[in-house]
């Protein structure tokens, strides 16, 4: 009875509980690593899937942040740069500008030259807070752009008070000095009286009256 109560040797327990190791190693000596792994099995690593999941979450967050960033043409330099979405908005902006110099940029979201020039234009807007910059998306305002004879992008119009349209020209990043020279010429102190001229052609033209005969 006393012998029956004695604990079995540890080696016998390991050998009995690991038949796979014994049978698999019948031709060779048993590996100590196999015995240790069977005698002391490691608990499952529950935290193992966490790193991949965290990486997926971080990747998803990075993609979400990138998708929420504004596109290049949606970035504005400040309160003196406004997006125009209709002819009425365009006319209202010119009217509300008063005697301020207004620079209108006609651009296309697909235009590589427009994109290259845009950061320089934003810096110019920051350097000239007294000038109002209007951005007109060509694809969103095709009828108005056609009436204003915009045939190439990027294209610029200069307006000021009762003087109306002062200049109209195309400009690229390589020729940006042309725009700065025009600013130096037209952004001078002045006072004007009356509504702006030169912008009425953006609306439907009134019916033309027959020309009167000139006096002989």
Swiss-Prot record:
Protein name: Thioredoxin-like 2, chloroplastic
Domain Thioredoxin per the UniProt entry, residue ranges: 61-188
Compositional bias segments (type: Low complexity): 19-40
Function: Probable thiol-disulfide oxidoreductase that may participate in various redox reactions.
Gene3D superfamilies assigned: Glutaredoxin
Protein location: Plastid, Chloroplast
Region spans: Disordered: 19-70
Superkingdom classification of source: Eukaryota
Major localisation: plastid
InterPro entries in the record: Thioredoxin-like_sf, Thioredoxin_CS, Thioredoxin_domain
Record-stated family: Belongs to the thioredoxin family.
GO biological process: cell redox homeostasis
Disulfide bonds: 111-114
Annotated Pro residues bias: 41-51
């Amino acid at each position: 009875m006393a012998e029956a109560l004695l604990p079995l040797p540890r080696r016998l327990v390991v050998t009995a509980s690991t038949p796979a190791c014994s049978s698999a190693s019948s031709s060779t000596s048993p590996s100590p690593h196999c015995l240790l792994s069977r005698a002391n099995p490691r608990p499952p690593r529950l935290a193992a899937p966490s790193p991949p999941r965290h990486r997926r979450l971080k990747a998803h967050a990075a993609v979400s942040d990138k998708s929420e960033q504004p596109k290049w043409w949606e970035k504005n330099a400040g309160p003196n740069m406004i997006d125009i979405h209709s002819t009425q908005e365009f006319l209202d902006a010119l009217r509300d500008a008063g005697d301020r110099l207004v620079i209108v940029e006609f651009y296309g979201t697909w235009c590589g030259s427009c994109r290259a020039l845009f950061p320089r234009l934003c810096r110019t807007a920051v350097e000239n807070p007294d000038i109002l910059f209007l951005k007109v998306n060509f694809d969103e305002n095709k009828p108005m752009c056609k009436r204003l004879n915009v045939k190439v992008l990027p294209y610029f119009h200069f307006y000021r008070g009762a003087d109306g349209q002062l200049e109209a020209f195309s400009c690229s990043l390589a020729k940006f000095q042309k725009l700065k020279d025009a600013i130096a010429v037209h952004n001078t102190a002045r006072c004007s009286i009356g509504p702006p001229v030169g912008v009425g052609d953006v609306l439907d033209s009134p019916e033309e009256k027959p020309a009167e005969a000139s006096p002989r």
